[in-house]
């Protein structure tokens, strides 16, 4: 690499100049513009920084191979026809070159282990080898004796045959003609054959007798060998006879030869009847059973004598039960079937399924009823153990900086006051000039170090203010001198009191002419906030964020209050803190803002936050500068968690990844169980409430926000907009950019897609343009809520408003052949219209409601008659009109409603 400018380096590596400048700043290099020169050493520093950020270390002995194969497969579709789909398989293998020093060390350790274990194995293997050798020698001697006996007995009978065969094989001369004198007679031949048969019978008897004696001797020797090596005198345990194939074969042969001819027939396939068929019925079944039994051999028959026996005494288990437990899990812990547990619950009056959860008390009664011992445990036992271990590992406590939360009503100058202290301009960067989420700032003043938490003042951010009050030591209540105590001011007072946090009042905007601090103090007194000037215990500072008036006095009050509280924490051991905010950044993943409360947080620590855990890959302060560690009362941003935790979750550094995974899984299970119970309860309530009612119009919303706290506040604000006539339903909510799946969900559920401080990616924009889905972006919470209100107003049914146009009194009633009863009337007020609806009133009571059939004046049909004029009219469908009745003409208008 050579020295080059930032612009040239960006072109060579294919990165945007702005992105490269940002990475250069993160690496701590001095270059700030595209024309600045970066040296070779600085380029190496930048590369090492990027590798460290992305979790990659330099390893020359590592290579990664990626393969991609494409194939097709046929699958059945819903129409019954097979369709072909493309299947792409991607494989990735990483090969690491072994280190020669490591290989040599492993070989040396393996050799030392073998040398240590060899002297120990030789004495242990010597008796077994000696026994095996003796067994093989005895078996070989027995086999040789049996063969010698058989050869000795049959030597006489086989010698003649062998000699004849040899002579026949060695004779090759032609056969001479037979002499007639040498031909024997028939009587001589019969005598010779009879003598040969007698000799053969004697030889057969002798041979059979010799074979039986040899077999008997072999059996006796094998029985002695089996008796010697098979079992001890007690017969309690079985020992292996021998491992040699020769001894095993001899014992097996002796065992087979111990059966008589009938048993051998049974073993070969059973006796046959005269027709050649096997005997059937029960006898044949017994023979087959006998055959299969004897095929197992000597070892199997001996082993079956010591098989498993069913225990007589019932096993009693210690069953651990949490706050809730699933019926199937409870049955598994007691080692019984699920139906038995369900039966017991039915006897107790509980109708449940195997996947349903029951409470701790009910589960304990079931366990006792089944005869086991219930042990009640806490669901947070593992978490408590981790906290106790972390507390024990901490060292001596020292004084720590105070954590101060600035609270108050919207637009009362909270962020501007904090800016004055920090000497920066943050409020101008907030959308709409209001704080949208909790901001954590670590400020080093001349008076000391103070950590400030800036909370939003809008009504929708109640949960954020509550979390800010719980995580703080001191609450600074900002009240505008020209506005006084407002609803969010009173709410902040309630949050501070609920958390037991001391309050310091800062009356802001004292530079305005309309400032009236006495009125503010009077209003605070009505909220039980009595200032020290009036004999109370609440410090009050008159400040102005614009001019800087009273800022030093406010800082003095904060530090004095922190000294009185004696705030201490340990800077050693595992870190413990709380999640201030969490968001998802594209390219960086989950970014979590943490306030460290105890211990020291370092890069590489294993962090457990809510139901997420992971190692800290990178850490930065509130200004985005990378740091390596953070002590108590210091806010930081970390990377490394797989997903964004909930704001307010407790953060703990653990050493054992297995325990961290167990605690995270347990928390996730509890959250999922609570969500399922809440949804089932809501469904049941909705079913009961909707019985007999019409469908209520609903505005479906898919919501995406930049941080968790803002998402929570927006969801709560939208749910509060629901009313009896129209409801708001948040179909899906999440943190991060709007994706294609969000657009698809909005299309399928006919929902409005809203993004707060986020944008849609390229795929999502293309999908929304194709499907005609409108994506709305917001940066101010007022605008988002107003648009949802307008959408709800469009779902409201219009209001029917009646306007009385005129009233006429019936003077005479005439009978007409065409209309029946016709009334002569005098218009008293307003105007009568022929095409408008009417009411007939008798003694100011409505007796008929309809329309006019005819309206005439001097026998001419007219459209309207004004007040003070006479007219004749006929009511359509009503003939019972009488004198002194009143005819009221009215009009109905549809008025569009709004929230």
UniProtKB/Swiss-Prot annotation:
GTP binds at residues 408-415, 454-458, 508-511. Residues 454-457 are annotated as: G3. Residues 147-164 have a biased composition (Low complexity). Pfam families: EF-G_D2 (PF22042), GTP_EFTU (PF00009), IF-2 (PF11987), IF2_assoc (PF08364), IF2_N (PF04760). Keywords: Cytoplasm, GTP-binding, Initiation factor, Nucleotide-binding, Protein biosynthesis. One of its GO terms (molecular function) is GTPase activity. It comes from Acinetobacter baylyi (strain ATCC 33305 / BD413 / ADP1). Residues 508-511 are annotated as: G4. This is Translation initiation factor IF-2. Gene3D superfamilies: P-loop containing nucleotide triphosphate hydrolases, Putative DNA-binding domain, N-terminal subdomain of bacterial translation initiation factor IF2, Translation factors, Translation initiation factor IF- 2, domain 3. PROSITE patterns: G_TR_2, IF2. It is found in: Cytoplasm. One of the essential components for the initiation of protein synthesis. Protects formylmethionyl-tRNA from spontaneous hydrolysis and promotes its binding to the 30S ribosomal subunits. Also involved in the hydrolysis of GTP during the formation of the 70S ribosomal complex. Belongs to the TRAFAC class translation factor GTPase superfamily. Classic translation factor GTPase family. IF-2 subfamily. Residues 544-546 are annotated as: G5. Residues 94-167, 259-309 are annotated as: Disordered. Residues 399-568 form the tr-type G domain. GO terms for cellular component: cytosol. Residues 107-121 have a biased composition (Basic and acidic residues). Signal peptide: none annotated. Residues 433-437 are annotated as: G2. Residues 408-415 are annotated as: G1.
